[in-house]
Amino acid sequence: MMDLKLRKDFLADVETAVVSAERKHPKICDNFCTKSKEDIASLLKIRQYLNDKAEGNGSSEWYEVIREEVLEAVEAFNVGQYKLCLQELAQVAAVAVRGMEFVYRLTEEYKAREKFNGGKSD
């Protein structure tokens, strides 16, 4: 598990990115998704099957997991389940932060910190 201070730093980075995105793309959501409900349901079913299979093989990838979460959010939106859509979008954000944590572990800063802590991971 990642150090909570680092996770807060990542969330602060996300907040900064949101502010920047609001300026850069002020009308980002004129439409949430223009694909049909049927197309989204089909894409989601396929993605869930592939992700379940990958997890069973121990070969799950971040990119595929976040795609599934996005599709789940769109599906909820398409059927008018807005509270569920918000929950799914929170899961998208959680998977994005987990991706940040994964990449951080590849940085020299993390490696130096781990070495300083006697090889103990965050």
Where are these regions (language model features)?
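Flexible "arm" and connector segments at domain edges
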Residues: M1-D122
